[in-house]
């Protein structure tokens, strides 16, 4: 029983629910695997414990520094507010100097206000466990250019941000992310298809 949810699956069944197959077709199919673990992370206590367990695992592997990224808006299914989610995750950091949080805005068609709230929370908790923002999700369905406007607010707040770009979409997505002010690019594998883009990123 985890977070009020009974898990009767075998280890192999759990792996099937959490891992994509070798013939995974695209990013959207990959992202579907987030749905199950998210059901277990809808209470503050579960979020705090998850962060602590993740950090303990990293420490045991000798990882010196990490930035744990997650989307607060995806943890509201049982009544938590985004701020309660962020506070729970910060609590799990236990004031660590070596493990921090990146708050993700999500690509979508009806969540602009949620994304704006994420940006405001990143501003509020910047330097208090939060170090940056991100934009994640289904890049092909919701192109990077659709989010230029809301990230102007992040720039106004001087919040550093990274953007997942150039994974499911082409190099133009990376170019847009750079134009938006991204300091880092998540994945960005399509850059390898363009010598000009490689030079621009160098």
Segments and roles (model prediction):
Residues 165:
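Active-site metal-binding loops of divalent metal-dependent hydrolases
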């Amino acid at each position: 029983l985890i977070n009020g949810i009974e898990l009767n699956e075998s280890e192999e069944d759990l792996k099937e629910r959490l891992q994509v197959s070798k013939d995974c077709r695209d990013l959207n199919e990959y992202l579907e695997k987030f749905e199950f673990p998210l059901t277990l992370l809808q209470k503050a206590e579960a979020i705090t414990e998850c962060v602590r367990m993740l950090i303990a695992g990293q420490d045991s592997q000798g990882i010196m520094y990490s930035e744990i990224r997650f989307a607060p808006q995806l943890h509201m299914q049982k009544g938590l507010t985004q701020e309660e989610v962020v506070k729970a995750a910060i609590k799990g950091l236990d004031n660590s100097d070596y493990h921090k949080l990146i708050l993700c805005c999500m690509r979508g068609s009806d969540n602009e206000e949620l994304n704006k709230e994420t940006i405001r929370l990143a501003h509020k908790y910047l330097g208090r466990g939060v170090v940056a923002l991100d934009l994640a999700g289904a890049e092909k369905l919701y192109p990077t250019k659709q989010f230029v406007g809301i990230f102007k607010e992040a720039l106004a707040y001087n919040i550093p941000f990274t953007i997942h770009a150039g994974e499911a979409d082409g190099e133009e997505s990376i170019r847009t992310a750079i134009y938006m002010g991204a300091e880092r690019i998540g994945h960005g594998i399509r850059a390898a298809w363009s010598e000009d883009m490689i030079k621009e990123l160098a």
